Amino acid sequence: MQRASESFDAIVVGSGISGGWAAKELTERGLRVLLLERGKHVEHAKDYANARKGPWEYPHRAGRSRDMIDAYPVLRRDYPLNEKNLDWWVNEKESPYTEVKRFDWYRGYHLGGRSLTWGRQSYRLSDLDFEANAKEGIAIDWPVRYADIAPWYDHVERHAGISGSIEGLPQLPDGQFDPPMPLNCAEATVAGRIAKKFSGRRMIPGRVANLTQPRPGRGRCQYRNACALGCPFGGYFSTQASTLPAAMATGRLTLKTFAIVTDIVFDRDRKRASGVRVLDAVTNATTEYSAKIVFLCASTLNSAWILMRSARDVWPGGLGSSSGELGHNLMDHHFRCGASGILPEHNDKTVYGRRPNGFYIPRFRNLFGDKRDYLRGFGYQGSASRQGWQRAVAELGVGGDFKDAMSMPGPWQIGSTGFGEMLPNHANRVTIDESRTDKWGLPVLSIDCETGENERLMRRDMMNDMAEMLEASGAREVRVNDNGSFPGMGIHEMGTARMGRDPKTSVLNAHNQVWDCLNLFVTDGSFMTSSACHNPSLGYMAFTARASAFAVEELKRGNL
């Protein structure tokens, strides 16, 4: 092993949503930062190889080949794996993991991580979420409240570019929004009828990290709905389009790709992290890099893996394990449960472009005096559109009349799936499986996680409530569905290094510092103390920016 000759003020591990924000905030506040990414370099626009291709330009018309299906046993289960997005997903044979219970882990090891492929829905937590654990006696209390985080939501929204509408809903705080992507005519009709017939229920435009107004160096969304291929216009928030250019512009960022962080180097005398050990993914050489502070942003499960492999001579369970909570309380959102129907009106209208967004129905259960036989609640995400020629694939029509009929759009269809909160549970955990190794000889992660009775009870309402709203709005042929949801499918994995008020019951404090090592900050989904019911990535941005500002001030004071 060799030691790098240059030391840094800060090391950031991971270049996804959290890592990109840490790099931006720390460099802009004057620190010299080393950003480490375990995967390949991806240059903005230039390396989005499929962003402008049509399906006819692929060997299998942007579908799946048998080789792809065989090579990706996890991705093939549910995610729409195809020729278009194959570049963004981990080779599962090179990077396996152990499933004690089924867990679908969708990983992207490359510069930018899943900031290139995320769904971009961006919602704030409220005190309803921050206070729920304490009020209900579940797990532990969050060490922060909305007032602590609200200024940082403002900060990241202004830079990232979140489009949305001002609604004044207590369960879903408003933000610093660009103009929303409007509901289409069918959605607006249903939204009006829901508001009229159901107290406390609202259908609003999704709040999404797609620009409706241009930013410096970024164009507004082109309504292509090809976001998961990388946007050469910078129309949605990603590391490449937003935070990385800002960090690079400071002249204080050093970027290294193909750099697998295997563990945090811990100085047991100072009780501080002195740096990280890095395995070169190409040469297998190991190098130790040093810094005054470390930000661990490798994504929830990889950050847990790194922590559990660090300082084991001091704590057998790894760095941050003194509470016994490291690796525990893994959560995800459960979904794929809702309803759909046909609207018999607006057949003289159709959609404009390919809007990369839909509607959102914020949580309404267990609020405003409503009391169910389960805790917490769910929100809905969905959209309405005209049916296309695919509606006739299963029919046996032939001839000119049939062809003419299929050349016209079909009726409006509307559908939605609920996203439900998953309660924290100590039994849902990850460990290191020393009996299996990956391509680089490193032991793999073992995941033992399942939903519980609370989630199962919630799914009944997720299905029936949507059907009720559609029927009341005039939809016909309303059908309910529950296609099952295993942890990991939501791609919102969080927990394993929760923040709290007491080092005896949590891994991190209120500023995302590891209690056992105060110059080590963890700001990806690991820190989540509960899951709420909506997409968490905006929260990761806000907490990362807040922790970065705090870290710089603590460095100046000599406390780190």
Please annotate each region the language model reported.
Residues 134-138, 173-177, 225-231, 290, ...:
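Glycine- and acidic
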Residues 204-211, 219-225, 262-269, 409-422, ...:
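A glycine-rich dinucleotide-binding beta-alpha-beta segment and adjacent secondary-structure elements
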Residues 59-66, 70-104, 109-110, 118-124, ...:
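Conserved redox-cofactor binding core of oxidoreductases
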Residues 28, 32, 39-59, 250, ...:
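Glycine-rich loop(s) and the adjacent beta-strand/alpha-helix scaffold that form part
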Residues 530-548:
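A conserved FAD-binding loop/helix module that cradles the flavin
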Residues 44-47, 163-175, 476-484, 557-560:
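Short, glycine/acidic-rich hinge or "gate" loops at secondary-structure transitions
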Residues 2-133, 138, 143, 147, ...:
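N-terminal glycine-rich phosphate/pyrophosphate-binding loop and immediately adjacent elements
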Residues 85-114, 118-119, 124, 142-143, ...:
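FAD cofactor-binding and catalytic pocket of flavoenzymes
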